[in-house]
Regions:
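Beta->alpha turn/N-cap motifs
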Residues: 29-30, 53-54, 65-82, 87-89, ...
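Long, low-complexity C-terminal extensions of enzymes
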Residues: 268, 274-300
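A short beta-strand-loop structural module common to alpha/beta enzyme folds
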Residues: 44-56
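N-terminal short beta-loop-beta anion/metal-coordinating cradle
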Residues: 83-104
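Pocket-lining segment of extracytoplasmic ligand-binding domains
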Residues: 144-240
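Bilobed "Venus flytrap"/periplasmic-binding protein-like clamshell domains
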Residues: 15-40, 51, 98-157, 162-168, ...
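Hydrophobic residues within well-ordered alpha-helices
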Residues: 61-62, 151-154, 278
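Secondary-structure end/capping motifs
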Residues: 209-277
Length: 300
């Protein structure tokens, strides 16, 4: 569920207005700083913002129902030839992320052959969890489940949970009582020494060719929104704490320490490392997939 207002459906265009770019936004708490920043800087007025889960936003982008937006890393890698990556903006971590977790009733090494529930809202976190368990020699019996911890644990020995439900399990002791909590961001960092990127911001290649000025405008607005939100993190956390079941200190730890909104050389190295370890015919993208950025550069 979105934590801020979202466009429910397409709005019929008014003939005398120029169409604004249709921009997909993740409706999780992890994107709240960017949403706050867009409102504070006025960038929100320059786009038609549509909020949903990473999976739904990515599907709409690939279908042409959005011009640009957030897309889970796995879906971007599978469709890299159709998309252009916007530099210096991403959603990731460089250590514990707090909102992408494996919650288990037993040590991870005991999950071999055991039922493990995979949340249905993000393919990237699911694939990362599978990689991390395989690295430990564990091959569970996976099944997909709605992102509800109680439902997951009623049917499984462990569950992969992301987004707001995962953050709630992390910060609310009663929700994770008796469960072992493993942070996917921290596990990846210990394994590779690199940051992990869960979602990137991309534009459709045909839209970039048709409206390069709009793409640059949205890119500039996102960077300004991020920087404004980070410079006013105390205000963002205090506002969010007034209507969320978390204290401002917990939100500050999440927004400013856990989440990483950058896409620089180390983050790109993390993406290419993930592609190298996860890529192949079965995944729908090659291990050496090329990342094409808006500034014309490529990374591999």
């Amino acid at each position: 569920m979105a934590v801020f207002p979202a466009t429910v459906g397409p709005v019929p265009p008014l003939p005398w207005l120029r169409r604004r770019p249709r921009v997909g936004h993740i409706g999780f708490l992890n994107s709240l700083p960017l949403y706050w920043g867009l409102g504070r800087t006025g960038g929100l007025l320059d786009m038609e913002l549509i909020s949903d889960t990473p999976t739904s936003i990515g599907g709409a982008l690939l279908a042409g129902d959005l011009d640009m937006g957030w897309i889970s890393l796995v879906e971007y890698l599978r469709n890299a030839d159709e998309l252009v990556l916007l530099p210096d903006i991403a959603l990731g971590c460089d250590g514990p992320v707090m909102s992408c977790l494996i919650l288990s009733t037993v040590p991870l090494e005991q999950l071999d052959g055991a039922p493990v529930a995979l949340c249905s809202t993000s393919r990237t976190s699911v694939r990362l969890a599978e990689l991390l368990l395989a690295e430990r020699g564990v091959k569970p019996d996976y099944f997909v489940c709605p992102p509800d911890l109680d439902t997951m644990m009623s049917r499984a020995r462990a569950g992969v949970l992301i987004g707001d439900p995962a953050l709630h399990a992390m910060l609310s002791e009663e929700r994770a009582d008796g469960l072992q909590v493993h942070d996917l961001g921290q596990m990846w960092r210990e394994w590779t020494g690199l940051p992990f990127v869960f979602a990137v911001f991309a534009a459709r290649r045909d839209f970039v060719a048709r409206e390069p000025g709009m793409v640059r405008m949205v890119h500039k607005a996102l960077l300004k929104a991020r920087d404004t939100a980070m410079a006013n993190s105390d205000t963002v956390c205090r506002k969010a704490a007034s209507w969320m079941p978390y204290g401002s200190d917990d939100l500050a730890r999440y927004f400013t320490n856990a989440l990483d909104f950058r896409l620089g050389p180390r983050q790109l190295a993390g993406i290419t490392e993930f592609a190298l370890r996860a890529g192949g015919d079965a995944e729908g993208f090659p291990p050496d997939v090329r990342l094409r950025l808006l500034d014309g550069t490529e990374a591999q």
